[in-house]
Design a protein with these regions (language model features):
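Conserved catalytic motifs of ABC-family nucleotide-binding domains
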Residues: 142
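The feature captures the beta-strand-to-loop junction immediately N-terminal to the Walker
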Residues: 35-37
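Helix-to-loop junction immediately C-terminal to a conserved catalytic motif
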Residues: 50
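Conserved ABC ATPase "signature" region
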Residues: 99-117
Length: 166
């Protein structure tokens, strides 16, 4: 797996460039942090890296990337579904049986210290628990590219530190 970005630029129609001449290479196992103030188009860049948006200029080459995990800036979920239902969902969507999917989902939840919350409804989770749940959902299908947008924004310092090591 390798992601190469060359001369990337982007703007929305009728606006100035949001960023320009951005180039980097992400090799397997490398973590890249994209930092900047609110509104500087970090989320837009992630959408381009995922292939959801086309850049204004430049190229993104994704070699060997066939499974992308994504964690949005704000945790979204179905209020009445359980935490386990949320993590199992992407596995079921790929055709796995619930019997096969549940152990994998619980393993991902354990990575983020959420095994205790498996039967809790999404609406009963704290903001930090919901954010960690979205991280568990993103990693349960073993993506070879993981994009996270403000992954620790709703987490306390201790939890934020432990999440960054996963």
């Amino acid at each position: 797996m390798r992601v190469a970005v060359e001369g990337l630029a982007h703007r929305f129609e009728g606006t100035d460039l949001l960023f320009e001449n951005l180039s980097f290479v992400a090799e397997p196992g490398v973590t890249i942090a994209i930092c900047g103030p609110s509104g500087c188009s970090k989320s837009t860049l992630l959408s381009i890296l995922a292939g959801w948006e086309q850049p204004y200029a430049g190229t993104v080459t994704r070699e060997g990337v066939d499974r992308v995990g994504w964690v949005f800036q704000n945790p979204y979920g179905v209020a009445e579904r359980t935490a386990l239902d949320h993590v199992v969902f992407p596995l079921l969507a790929k055709g796995m049986s619930r019997r096969e999917a549940e152990p994998k989902a619980l393993e991902a939840m354990e990575l983020f210290d959420l095994e205790y919350a498996a039967d809790r409804r999404f609406c009963a989770l704290s903001g930090g628990e919901a954010q960690r749940l979205m991280l568990a959902r993103a990693v349960c299908s073993r993506p070879n590219m993981l994009l996270v947008d403000e992954p620790t924004a709703q987490l306390d310092t201790r939890t934020s530190h432990s999440v960054s090591h996963v």
